[in-house]
């Protein structure tokens, strides 16, 4: 597996469990069994890693929702299933993640909001 992907997947796991602010790049390197220097070869800083995690996470949800849309019986069923999927995502998310994004990672939060707005517009039409 590509190290960039491996790092992003581990970051998402740790961020969802502990919140973004609570997980340092040093913690990340330890969890991955690599040095901080190696970690910084793949991501320039934590902000870049956070943005990548948000991008990957929202892309996974988008693809899942597109699949749900294809399998839904009708438009009402589609909306119900998609909202159920999105709510499941929020239930499984540490509440600190969105707070940390908004307060400490504005670019990541902006990306999340853009996704949310595009997502809603796309699936409501």
Question: What label would you give each PLM region?
Answer:
Residues 19-20, 66, 70, 95-101:
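Short, flexible helix-adjacent loops and helix caps
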């Amino acid at each position: 597996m590509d190290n960039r992907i491996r790092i992003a997947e581990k970051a998402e796991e740790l961020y969802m469990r502990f919140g973004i602010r609570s997980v340092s790049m040093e913690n990340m390197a330890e969890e991955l069994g690599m040095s901080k220097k190696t970690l910084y070869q793949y991501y320039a800083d934590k902000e870049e890693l956070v943005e990548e995690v948000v991008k990957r996470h929202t892309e996974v949800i988008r693809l899942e929702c597109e699949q749900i849309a294809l399998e839904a019986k009708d438009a009402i069923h589609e909306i119900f299933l998609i909202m159920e999927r999105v709510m499941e995502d929020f239930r499984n998310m540490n509440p600190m993640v969105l707070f940390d994004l908004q307060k400490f990672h504005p670019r990541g939060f902006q990306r999340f909001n853009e996704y949310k707005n595009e997502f809603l517009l796309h699936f409501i039409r």
